């Protein structure tokens, strides 16, 4: 890492070097692990693309280079929300470089951020949920599905849980946010706790600081990749689309609102800083009410 610092000081300014410095800055500022991983997922492919296209130095990156990259992403038929998020992350990267005086001006200043479709990706239907639960092969798999549906937890939050984070008597689950950040409380109901106990009987009750979810092949803590692969394979097997951790989170949000939960209570449970996204779910749940009125309204059914 000192080598990176030395090269930056000597104005070498290779794209790969400044990327490492950017990630180091985020780590030193104690960004949450999920946020840090998002930066890596969205910026590193751009850095690698630059390297494979002989764009080695910062001075080689022009607005045209960035537009070419974003256009190629569109040609791959990536979701508009995904491309929008990538562009925002790249913009943050270049803004940081300007702040650090490694660039005089960000090449992103002249690049329009691709618009994201406002539609929300679909949640699971009741039929999807039934199929998911009927086709799990192990106690762990069923426990994971119920836990995600019941808590609205993010994938990283689920995977970081230890035995001491879950109160099996009350259903209170503490989501640890790391130093400098406030922990969050979510809840799981009786059915989820009963299934979790069945999983514990199989794996052994985890100790206070021991990770709850283990790989079934290695016995080591389950990783984000392992979780995603398990859900993807299950979705393909039973023909349920978008079977990812975040679809469970969307399902939790939409069904909580459908069942009458306050949007502000939901905001706290999901750990959102604002309710902008949740308002879109609220609109969907209100559409449900309108459809129900069309079907069951007193006057129109006279």
Language model features: what each stretch is:
Residues 1-302:
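Conserved catalytic core of the tyrosine transesterase superfamily
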């Amino acid at each position: 890492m000192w080598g990176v610092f030395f090269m930056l000081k000597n104005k070498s300014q290779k794209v790969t070097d400044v990327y490492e410095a950017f990630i180091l800055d985020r780590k030193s500022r104690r960004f949450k692990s999920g946020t840090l991983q998002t930066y890596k997922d969205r910026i590193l492919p751009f850095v690698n693309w630059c390297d494979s296209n002989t764009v080695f130095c910062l001075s080689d990156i022009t607005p045209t280079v960035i537009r070419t990259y974003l256009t190629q992403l569109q040609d791959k038929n990536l979701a508009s929300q995904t491309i929008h998020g990538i562009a925002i992350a790249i913009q943050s990267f270049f803004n940081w470089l300007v702040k650090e005086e490694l660039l005089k001006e960000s090449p992103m200043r002249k690049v329009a951020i691709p618009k994201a479709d406002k539609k929300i990706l679909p949640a699971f239907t009741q039929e999807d949920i039934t199929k998911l639960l009927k086709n799990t092969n192990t106690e762990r798999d069923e426990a994971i599905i119920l836990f995600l549906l019941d808590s609205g937890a993010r994938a990283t939050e689920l995977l970081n849980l230890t035995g001491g984070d879950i109160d099996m008597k009350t259903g209170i689950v503490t989501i640890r946010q790391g130093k400098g950040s406030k922990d969050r409380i979510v809840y799981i109901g009786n059915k989820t706790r009963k299934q979790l106990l069945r999983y514990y009987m199989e794996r052994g009750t985890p100790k206070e600081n021991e990770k709850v979810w283990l790989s079934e092949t290695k016995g080591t803590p389950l990783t984000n990749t392992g979780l995603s692969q398990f859900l993807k394979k299950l979705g393909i097997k039973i023909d349920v689309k978008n079977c990812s951790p975040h679809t469970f989170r969307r399902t939790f949000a939409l069904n909580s609102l459908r069942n009458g939960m306050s949007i502000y209570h939901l905001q706290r449970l999901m750990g959102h800083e604002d309710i902008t996204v949740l308002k879109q779910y609220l609109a969907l749940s209100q559409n449900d009410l309108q459809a129900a009125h069309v079907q069951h309204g007193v006057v129109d059914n006279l």
